[in-house]
Amino acid sequence: MNKRNHIRLPPEVNRLLYVRNLPYKITSDEMYDIFGKFGAIRQIRVGNTPETRGTAFVVYEDIFDAKNACDHLSGFNVCNRYLVVLYYQSNKAFKRVDMDKKQEELNNIKAKYNLKTPEAP
């Protein structure tokens, strides 16, 4: 039986890594050279707009390879820039924005109908 089957990983660990602080001119091939040492990669997307430059997403085939890459490449020096490698958390990225939007909608409804929140006893 494979040893990996018995290892419990933290819930934030997944196959999708978000990489920040990349050199702006880094290519996908260079990213494959750096990240490919840790396992098979399904896809790499390097940011190319003004808002996403210096960032990338790396998708590994295996979650353990992604964990190994995250552990070893966070703080790795590439062209005098230290990489920030994180597990991508889509729910965390949008949860706060979603909550703020819902609160704003609630406040608008209260204002529209002149409602007040009852005070707790």
Curated annotation (Swiss-Prot):
Annotated GO CC locations: catalytic step 2 spliceosome; precatalytic spliceosome
SMART domains: RRM
Subcellular location(s) per record: Nucleus
Domain RRM: from-to ranges: 15-90
Predominant location category: nucleus
InterPro entries named in the record: Nucleotide-bd_a/b_plait_sf, RBD_domain_sf, RRM_dom, RRT5_SRSF_SR, SF3B6_RRM
Superkingdom in the source lineage: Eukaryota
The entry's keywords: mRNA processing, mRNA splicing, Nucleus, RNA-binding
GO MF: mRNA binding
GO biological process: mRNA splicing, via spliceosome
Keyword Glycosyltransferase appears in the UniProt entry: no
Gene3D superfamilies the record matches: 3.30.70.330
Keyword Aminoacyl-tRNA synthetase tagged: no
Region described as Interaction with pre-mRNA branch site: 12-25
Subunit structure: Component of splicing factor SF3B complex. Component of the U11/U12 snRNPs that are part of the U12-type spliceosome.
Function: Involved in pre-mRNA splicing as a component of the splicing factor SF3B complex. SF3B complex is required for 'A' complex assembly formed by the stable binding of U2 snRNP to the branchpoint sequence (BPS) in pre-mRNA. Directly contacts the pre-mRNA branch site adenosine for the first catalytic step of splicing. Enters the spliceosome and associates with the pre-mRNA branch site as part of the 17S U2 or, in the case of the minor spliceosome, as part of the 18S U11/U12 snRNP complex, and thus may facilitate the interaction of these snRNP with the branch sites of U2 and U12 respectively.
Family: Belongs to the SF3B6 family.
This protein's name: Splicing factor 3B subunit 6
